[in-house]
């Protein structure tokens, strides 16, 4: 007998986002974020990682899309400080305005949520090193621990396979570090699985192997 009320949510969101996700982001779950190209998937995945860390979860973040550790690190600092390091304006100038969803609704019978209210904020300039240091200090103060909650592993596209991910996680386990949450950004750029498979079959097989990470 399974008690759905006892499913452990590893990452919880407040407000409407919390109602949307409910306990989807729970232990043992496999969740895929789908969007068009340049559709903020990476932003969402980093947000999930950040919230998991704030909730004292061990997070393993794999980037398979050619980003460097510095690239991902800067984006993570942006999320910690809630402050951009690059202007979204076409000409790259400051000040810059950024809007994020504040309220959403899902009509009965619909699969997609609609944003009904946005939060707008203007930034006079880019994120600075001093701001990042202060943001990390506040996060460490909240966590009240010297334990490492975040591990990052970046790889060129088509060079990282699911088997490699499992090996890296096993290596961390030998150091007595065990992830609660495993996030793979650019999963569509993972190396093909072993064996001679058609392109579509390779993609399907990789998704099956990724699912096994949570089991």
Would you name each region that the model predicts?
Residues 2-71, 79, 154-215:
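P-loop NTPase motor core
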Residues 12, 17-21, 57-178:
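Cytosolic-facing regulatory segments adjacent to core modules
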């Amino acid at each position: 007998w399974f008690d759905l009320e006892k499913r452990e949510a590893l990452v919880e969101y407040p407000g409407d986002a919390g109602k949307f996700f409910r306990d989807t982001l729970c232990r043992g779950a496999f969740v895929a974020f789908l969007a068009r190209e340049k559709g903020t998937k990476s932003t969402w995945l980093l947000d999930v990682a950040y919230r998991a860390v704030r909730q004292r979860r061990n997070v393993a973040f794999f980037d398979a899309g050619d980003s460097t550790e510095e690239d991902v690190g800067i984006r993570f600092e942006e999320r910690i400080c809630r402050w951009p390091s690059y202007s979204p304006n076409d000409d790259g100038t400051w000040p810059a305005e950024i809007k994020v969803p504040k309220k959403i609704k899902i009509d009965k019978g619909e699969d997609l949520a609609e944003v009904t209210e946005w939060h707008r904020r203007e930034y006079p300039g880019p994120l600075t090193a001093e701001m990042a240091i202060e943001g990390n200090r506040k996060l460490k103060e909240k966590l009240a621990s010297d334990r490492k909650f975040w591990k990052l592993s970046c790889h060129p596209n088509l060079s990282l396979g699911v088997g490699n991910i499992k090996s890296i996680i096993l290596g961390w386990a030998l150091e007595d570090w065990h992830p609660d949450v495993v996030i793979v950004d650019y999963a569509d750029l993972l190396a093909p699985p072993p064996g001679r498979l058609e392109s579509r079959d390779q993609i399907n097989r990789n998704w099956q192997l990724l699912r096994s990470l949570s089991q």
